[in-house]
């Protein structure tokens, strides 16, 4: 049975990278343009998205621009410009004058997952090595990954400050350049004004999105959030409509990023908290569990120190109940649909077909028009079954159908979206797939599924539970005789999918690769037996894992190492670790594995130079002396550090960094009472 409530979902899945040009931007060969600029010793200027007001747009955004707007490259704005660096993995982006909080909330969610971010933002780009003023980004665009090439000229005011997206690190520019690339894809900066978080999340990932109306949310919302935060998801949310800042600190009609969740214990009862961030980088919630709330005194000293950061950075905690009260939509995006099904041990497959509604031929409108034109809509046959049981099985199959309409103009906001939906019929008899079903079929048969209402959205989708068999899908526009193109996709465990009367023939479903699926299933089963694990059980769990990038030199986690790891992550001083705490740990372990593997030369150890490089790679700056001391403390007699010791060091440094940042008032020092100091020094 699916964990997720039957709310309207939006589904996406990305095929392999493509070099196709999109309607919004021309085919530009990044490598050829870069080579030409380097050969000629010049900086790239993108004539298809010039540094002029035409790229800003022609609407209300022009009225917000500062006087004497200029376009400058990052090396003109800072003496040491950086494209990206790992230390900035904390939320550092701030919204500019464009009303694109929906885009920035999605971007902040993307920034929390460096492996996903690196697909959209190639992180090896810089302002030094092979710099020619040209940058490239990738977006999932209506079924394909497309590259978007831009120059690095950015709009600034007279003081040289960025007027659109900026970073709290003044020399960091990946966010501003990504916004420019997305504006180019959309038509202009003006075309980024207003939108849905789900739209940007999908364009960044090609992943699976589900939108939950919080007013209708079921009682298992916390379970959904736990599973979502563990499964490499991107999560955004939106407040109720309006345009003002409320007395409680929330902004009406605004998008936020959900950056974390935490179950804490207050006076022997649990409290469920969610952590959110305002894309403005300021203006925070003022209620219970806000930065100045007295509720924090109910926690253990260690838990308070590691969770509470008194800083007007736009990030704050609030209870799950307050979240449901003050927010209207929760948007969860994952790379594969496996998150939404409990059909264990089976891979997902998908099929994607493109089609079009043509005036006076295939644009038949909704079913109420069935007497005249409904039957003229495109018709698709779908056969589904459970692969492990064959086609004679009667057990239901999880199926997801997604209908996505393509833009009707190169500028995102120039032509509004049409109201779209789809109908699903059960086919009880064999049908010749070369002949369109006649009007009589639709007069005699009632749809198994139909739209509650037609939505003017980029995509409409539905999760279905179908008996094995053959079905008919009819995508349509609310009104007949409107021209548009669409993408129709189906996700299931096994299916065949094709268009009636099409020359393209039968399309068999393709497997979706999810390398984490088996691992996730293993963890879930382990914690079903042991809801809270101690150091011995943690040791058992970690030593059962295969560390793929470490090759034949698989690490061994000693009991002492696991006791040290547990002490670092045990915020409520219970001596055990919950599945939520383990999931946080596992994310950090996977990142540490990548960093270690990159610097290791096949010996299974890091020397001083490699350790220094690994720490820099992770965004941690240690002096030479401290780095040497870390080798003495965590390395062996030969001053070499193995993987397990490296993990312990990384976790400890992250822990100490969080303590300092949460407690410091001036960025230079902190104040701790003696009990707090003893707790942090001895049990961490």
UniProtKB/Swiss-Prot annotation:
Keywords from the named record: Calcium, Hydrolase, Metal-binding, Protease, Repeat, Thiol protease
Residue ranges annotated for the EF-hand domain, each copy included: 557-592, 586-621, 651-684
GO cellular component, one term: cytoplasm
PROSITE patterns: CALPAIN_CAT, EF_HAND_1, EF_HAND_2, THIOL_PROTEASE_CYS
Active-site residues, as the UniProt record annotates them: 101, 254, 278
Binding site residues for Ca(2+): 570, 572, 574, 576, 581
Region (Domain III): 337-503
Domain Calpain catalytic: 43-336
Enzyme Commission numbers on file: 3.4.22.-
SMART domains named in the record: calpain_III, CysPc
Matches recorded under CDD domains: Calpain_III, CysPc, EFh_PEF_CAPN13_14
A GO BP annotation: proteolysis
Pfam family, one: Calpain_III
Region annotation Linker: where it falls in the sequence: 504-517
Segments for region (Domain IV): 518-683
Tissues where this protein is expressed: Not expressed in tissues tested.
Stated role: Calcium-regulated non-lysosomal thiol-protease.
Family recorded in the similarity comment: Belongs to the peptidase C2 family.
Protein name: Calpain-14
Lineage: Eukaryota, Metazoa, Chordata, Craniata, Vertebrata
